[in-house]
Amino acid sequence: MRSDQIKRGAVRAPNRCLLYSTGISPGDLDKPFIGIASSFTDLVPGHVAMRDLERYVERGIAAGGGVPFIFGAPAVCDGIAMGHSGMHYSLGSREIIADLVETVANAHMLDGLILLSNCDKVTPGMLMAAARLNIPAIVVTAGAMMTGMYDKKRRSMVRDTFEAVGQFQAGKITEKQLSELEMAACPGAGACQGMYTANTMACLTETMGMSMRGCATTLAVSAKKKRIAYESGIRVVALVKKDVKPRDILTLAAFKNAIVADMALGGSTNTVLHLPAIANEAGIELPLELFDEISKKTPQIACLEPAGDHYMEDLDNAGGIPAVLFAIQKNLAHSKTVSGFDIIEIANSAEILDEYVIRAKNPYKPEGGIAILRGNIAPRGCVVKQAAVSEKMKVFSGRARVFNSEDNAMKAILDNKIVPGDIVVIRYEGPAGGPGMREMLSPTSALHGMGLSDSVALLTDGRFSGGTRGPCIGHISPEAAADGAIVAINEGDTININIPERTLNVELTDDEIKARIGKVIKPEPKIKTGYMARYAKLVQSADTGAVLK
């Protein structure tokens, strides 16, 4: 066992002495040491219920014949960090999480890991660590939140409260209604209720085979989630004994399966950042072209919030990820899972329990939820969640309204300075320029709440929340901070969007773009000290997954 390096031989007497001081017994030295990387925090709704899950994981590890050791990992709530300077830190926290898990696991020579995760950057960060360390590991995602109820309708945090800000600003609802809604939309613990980034990543984690069957869609408050945590603890010890490692599971086939599921579910555009970053740690390249190639061949068979009216609880009741895999199995490749079953076996053994939620025979859309666009604005690509774009906005031309930060754009939107026919361009919000590639949920939600999502588009080198809907194009590469063509766009330029043709262009010649780029004076860095200042110097382009050099 790997842990023998800290517990065997006379020379390790000091190490054993310290281990005994934690309360373990001599007999425990013969057992695998299993770390539980817990991202519990009182700050994040998706993570507040993890104390219970920690106990069940511990019990499972002990029942399986291992010794559990809990250690902490940070978690950022993108919803709480949204719309202010705190959002600079969200994407960068992914790398911190990966580095911290690697540090603890290697410093203490752990034999295996349970990665207790849930929210947006935590799950990819922990998967990056698993692929990098390549020691037996299972991810336990803590589960989605139940829907809220207000005015006789089910509600969610992302679509209802963020868009309510725009509705209030437009005079469509009162301050009292806004207050009542914010109290009702989030009834308890769990990740935000729709197919936003956290739940998308949970679904893809299960599809890739890194979590147990049913884990992704089981609600945070359910007893079933506790049983999954317990079973995961037992199973990770078996993986250690059989020497089954993450890179045995995280193969190119597994990543392709994840992209297929992503497209079928209409998942978050943030997966186009996270899957390549995880694959990079496993020594696999996932180019943007692969996402688009798979999207064109994969119908969208589920439509959850924000694009539709279903929630994670509905997907779970319809059979969860196994039922989704059953519906798309002809597009899947054989791949191992932590459960010991091939992903095709899991798909074949499932059934669809609600054909209105999972529409295998009558897909919601003929193509997958995400499209990759290219053109003279984004020669290295950009991303749009086409599942959340109305048909009338899939081909659109408009006048550029240019802002060098999200804050300035948001002020213009709330001051009613954006009108139908405009295309809002927000730049210097990329991985390096942001820094941290802030999510633009506040401006997109405000536009929708003000009734402009069918007449105004938004482009950015930043990114979008999984809760974004409307013609919102992000991840424009190269970014403004890297002298990308987005800096050449001036106020009033005409921009043409054609999602079916996968193009995004400004009506300028190549020579005009080059000349304008040469005259640009870059703004001062927004953050000059601390982690994010270092991050800005090391982070690569969005089309690489925004990984560090």
Swiss-Prot record:
Function as written in the Swiss-Prot or TrEMBL entry: Functions in the biosynthesis of branched-chain amino acids. Catalyzes the dehydration of (2R,3R)-2,3-dihydroxy-3-methylpentanoate (2,3-dihydroxy-3-methylvalerate) into 2-oxo-3-methylpentanoate (2-oxo-3-methylvalerate) and of (2R)-2,3-dihydroxy-3-methylbutanoate (2,3-dihydroxyisovalerate) into 2-oxo-3-methylbutanoate (2-oxoisovalerate), the penultimate precursor to L-isoleucine and L-valine, respectively.
InterPro entries found in the cross-reference section: Dihydro-acid_dehy_C, DihydroxyA_deHydtase, DiOHA_6PGluconate_deHydtase_CS, ILV_EDD_C, ILV_EDD_N, IlvD/EDD_N
Keywords assigned by UniProt, alphabetized: 2Fe-2S, Amino-acid biosynthesis, Branched-chain amino acid biosynthesis, Iron, Iron-sulfur, Lyase, Magnesium, Metal-binding
UniProt modified residues of type N6-carboxylysine: 121
EC number: 4.2.1.9
Coiled-coil region(s): none
Enzyme class of the recorded protein, top EC level: lyase
Annotated protein name in UniProt: Dihydroxy-acid dehydratase
Pathway field: Amino-acid biosynthesis; L-isoleucine biosynthesis; L-isoleucine from 2-oxobutanoate: step 3/4; Amino-acid biosynthesis; L-valine biosynthesis; L-valine from pyruvate: step 3/4
Domain of life assignment: Bacteria
Active site per UniProt: 465 (proton acceptor)
Catalytic activity: (2R)-2,3-dihydroxy-3-methylbutanoate = 3-methyl-2-oxobutanoate + H2O; (2R,3R)-2,3-dihydroxy-3-methylpentanoate = (S)-3-methyl-2-oxopentanoate + H2O
Binding site for Mg(2+): 78, 120-121, 439
Source species of the chain: Endomicrobium trichonymphae
Cofactor, how bound (note): Binds 1 [2Fe-2S] cluster per subunit. This cluster acts as a Lewis acid cofactor.
Family note: Belongs to the IlvD/Edd family.
Needed co-factor(s): [2Fe-2S] cluster; Mg(2+)
Molecular function per GO: 2 iron, 2 sulfur cluster binding; dihydroxy-acid dehydratase activity; magnesium ion binding
GO BP term, pick one: isoleucine biosynthetic process
Pfam families: ILV_EDD_C, ILVD_EDD_N
Annotated binding of [2Fe-2S] cluster, by residue: 119, 192
Subunit text: Homodimer.
GO terms for cellular component: cytosol
Gene: ilvD
